């Protein structure tokens, strides 16, 4: 649940390093922007519902084409930083905090 207090505390605790985690994991620039958009949504939202945007809406938000969104969303999903449930306008997109914790632990254990 996005509005969960512990989730918000976690998101605030990684605010200084989220760009590093994204850059380390996601190679495609638009895919990085998608993950960062989802992070910002969850960090600022008071909603209990994950982000739900169609390809067209997400393309408009990020100022890219729908075709670019399709391929970049696939790359963002393969990074495991976001979880996507459903298709099209019914799609829900949320951060995968378990993967972010694994990345944080591996980066800071070096």
Predicted regions and their residues:
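Short intrinsically disordered terminal tails
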Residues: 1, 62-63, 110
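Winged helix-turn-helix DNA-binding recognition segment
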Residues: 43-95
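Short, amphipathic alpha-helical interaction segments positioned at domain boundaries
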Residues: 100-110
């Amino acid at each position: 649940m996005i509005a969960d207090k512990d989730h918000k505390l976690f998101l605030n605790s990684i605010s200084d390093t989220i760009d590093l985690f994204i850059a380390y994991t996601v190679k495609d620039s638009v895919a990085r922007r998608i993950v960062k958009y989802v992070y910002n949504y969850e960090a600022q939202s008071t909603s209990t519902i994950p982000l739900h945007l169609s390809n067209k809406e997400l393309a408009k938000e990020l100022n890219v084409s729908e075709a670019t969104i399709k391929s970049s969303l696939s790359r963002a999903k393969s990074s495991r930083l976001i979880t996507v449930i459903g298709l099209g306008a019914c799609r829900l997109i949320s951060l995968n905090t378990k993967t972010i914790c694994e990345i944080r632990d591996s980066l800071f254990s070096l």
